[in-house]
Amino acid sequence: MDKIFLIDKHTITYNDLIHYINGQLSIWDSEYTELERFVLDTIKRLVSEPYIENHSHLIDVMEDTNGNIELRTSGTTGEPKIIYQSFEKMIRNIKLKDENMVWGLFYSVDRMAGYQVLFQALLNKDTLVNMNGYDYKEIQQRIVSYGVTHISATPTLYKMILDRVYPNVKQITFGGERSSKELQHKISDYFPNARVKNIYASTEAGSLFASNGDTFTIPKKFMDKIRIKNDEIWLHKDIVGESFHMKWDGDWYNTGDLVTFVNRNEFKIVGRSTNIVKIGGYNVNLELVESKIQQLDGVKLVKITSKENSVLGNILIGEIIHYDGYSLIDIKRNMKNVLEKWEIPTKLKVVESIELTENGKIKR
């Protein structure tokens, strides 16, 4: 029986993939979705031989490739930047397993995180189910109906689907944003059979750290390639892709990701340096404020931004999606129990949706 490779609008098998690479299948008509064409064409461009016999032959050929892949950064705080990353670096942490996994593709497939999920499925001959571009009700249905077993997504995306139980899911992976123990504990209620992983990756260098909680350590193999300086993560040029947009300090690149140490070796990712604002003399982390509000009963998702103020320097403005049965008045009252005075938003409004990037991060 031919194994299913990709499910989007159509079901594409591994034989279909091989036939396309060999010129025996045309996808350039309106029947195929943009994602289906992009995935098949991306793989074909990484193949240097004129004829592929089977999946094993395909993987052997791809692993020998010297090709680079064009990636875009997430564009969370501005226009995405272009990075060129080698295929070898992109698959360096992928483990081959015989588990018949079904992966949910929540990320945009032309970003680092999307490529890594794609290649994880491809190298293991697993099935990939596209979730990107579908609304949350459709996503919930697709997770269940297609028997998705593995999900990699941002904390924000998980928050939006936590109103039903998914017993079929075996592994949950966080990435792309600050995570918290509170969210990970909540996840266990809705994904009762899933183990939880937390990944730190960047478009510039790929996957770098992994843990089962919310703290990380620098792996031994990267000890001389990653440093923490002024509470920010810096990467050496040897592990970073090529780009005309990156600003260097000698051989080092500042990711802008902030950490706080919990002991000599372990640290937490606490957000982006661009999300620190001054309010009345205090440094306020917008992501930390969001995390605190997110803990409150009734809060489904919250976004905090800042606006310049002549008296305080900045004020905080919030958008919130809450569950039925809860009021904004109650949520505001409870904020005083978890926020410092200078962290309380001056303005807070209820919205039906919060704008996200293509990768499922809150867009600021």
What is the role of each PLM region?
Residues L258-E343:
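AMP-binding/adenylate-forming catalytic core of the ANL superfamily
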Residues L339-I362:
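AMP-binding/adenylate-forming catalytic domain of the ANL superfamily
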Residues N66-K95:
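Conserved AMP-binding A3 loop
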Residues N193-D231, K237, G241-G250:
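Conserved ATP-binding loop and adjacent catalytic segment of the adenylate-forming AMP-binding
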Residues L162-F216:
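Gly/Ser/Thr-rich phosphate-binding loop
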Residues I91-V102, D110-H150:
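Conserved AMP-binding/adenylation subdomain of ANL enzymes
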Residues Y20, Y32, S48-H57, D126-Y146, ...:
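ATP-dependent adenylate-forming carboxylate-activation enzymes
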Residues K229-E266, R272, Y282-V284:
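Conserved ATP/PPi-binding loop(s) of AMP-dependent carboxylate-activating enzymes
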